[in-house]
Amino acid sequence: MPNTLVLNGLLILVGILIGCLVGYFFRKNIAEGKISNAEDLAKKIVEDAEKDAETTKKELLLEAKEEVHKLRNELERENRERRNELQRTERRLIQKEEALDKKSETLELKDEKLNKKLKELDNKELEINNLYQKEVEKLEELSGLTSEEARELILSDVEKQTKYEVALMIKDIESKAKEESEKKAREVIAYSIQKCAADHVAETTVSVVQLPSDEMKGRIIGREGRNIRTLETLTGIDLIIDDTPEAVILSGFDPIRREVARIALEKLIVDGRIHPARIEEMVEKARKEVDNIIKEAGEQATFETGVHGLHPELVKLLGRLKYRTSYGQNVLNHSIEVSYLAGIMAAELGADVKLAKRAGLLHDIGKAVDHEIEGTHVEIGMELLKKYKESKDVIHAMSTHHGDYEPESIEAILVTAADAISAARPGARRETLESYIKRLEKLEEIANGHDGVEKSYAIQAGREIRIIVKPEVYNDEEIFMLARNITKKIEFELEYPGQIKVNVIRETRAIEYAK
């Protein structure tokens, strides 16, 4: 049994070996067949590739030859075009060169002609100079004047003629400007005055208190004059008791103190009890009453003019102007009138109405305290307005109304004009005889101070001065320059309300006697 198994195993092993050998040889034969086939296929592929490559090579060579041919043709065409363009450019250059040659020849001909003409002109100029010199010598010989003297004579004549023409032009321009400005000013001022009607009460330095009887005079004087002394001491006013029937005169330059004394005295007369203690009580009441009157007057002025927002102290100062006068004109009423006029004129001219009215109302505010503070009323007024925070425009507009400062705004000019209109209105002011006479004398003195003035007369209460000149000194045109110069001197040297008319008269008379 075991031997049989071994034998079977050996047989199986031998069978496997034989199978392996048979398989090896079989695969070898198959592989060799495949290799042979592959070699044949490879040869065929190579042959086909060589044929395709040859064909492609031939096609590429053909295409390259065609491209080269095409490029050659293109280059030849471009070369032909360039040659043609160069030929055309060459022809144009040749034509330009020929044209330049022709122009050059023409210019040379013209240059020759110009040179000839210049030579001819030089010769003619020399000839003219010679002729001119000969003529000058002949003229000098005939006239007896040198050329320099003749030139001065001609210049003098030209200067006179020019001055004459300038005077005519100035006369014409001034006449037209004056006519237009006066027409417009008259329209504005007339319209303004028509809309303004202010009352003016002329005040003096005395007040009169009526008495019920002359017996009251003794009671006012009191025992040994103690009553009158007390009243004068408390008020600072002089009481004049004379032979005037049933009247006592209060004299003093401070109108507010005079008003306090008047009210106190009237109250004492009504009360009947007149002694120092009662006098002191009544004076104190009168002061309070006057303070209230002042306050109400200031408030009424601001209400009437429509000026609002003033500092209370400025309102009080305005009220004090109720008791101030200037040349007999009540200053508060004058200020209200100036405010009205300035506002109306500002409205007509398109200026700032509120500014003009405010500055017009405050323009004389310094007069309320000018007897207490040193300085002009303009300077005092400026300081007061600065103190109470008024605007720079208002301060400037009020500061120019007496010419102390140059006006820089139309409102300032309008305030000045309104002040002059109010002051110059007939009956508004009066002045002392002495100052009036001095002003007239000064007017005539200014006029007589000019050469060629024969006589001068101040007329129309100093509103006009007539000047008679010597006709041999001034001609008809030069008198306008004289009038202008005199006007400027009057404006510079004199102070006067309103305006002064300067009338220059030139009269020529021819007198002969028949024998």
From Swiss-Prot:
The chain crosses the membrane at residues 6-26. It is found in: Cell membrane. The keyword Protein transport does not apply. InterPro entries: HD/PDEase_dom (IPR003607), HD_domain (IPR006674), HDIG_dom (IPR006675), KH_dom (IPR004087), KH_dom_type_1 (IPR004088), KH_dom_type_1_sf (IPR036612), Ribonuclease_Y (IPR017705), RNase_Y_N (IPR022711). One of its GO terms (biological process) is mRNA catabolic process. It is a single-pass membrane protein. Residues 331-424 form the HD domain. CDD domains: HDc (cd00077), KH-I_RNaseY (cd22431). It holds the Pfam family HD. The keyword Cytoplasm does not apply. One of its GO terms (cellular component) is plasma membrane. One of its GO terms (molecular function) is RNA binding. Residues 205-290 form the KH domain. Its EC number is 3.1.-.-. Keywords: Cell membrane, Endonuclease, Hydrolase, Membrane, Nuclease, RNA-binding, Transmembrane, Transmembrane helix. Belongs to the RNase Y family. Endoribonuclease that initiates mRNA decay. This is Ribonuclease Y. It comes from Alkaliphilus oremlandii (strain OhILAs) (Clostridium oremlandii (strain OhILAs)).
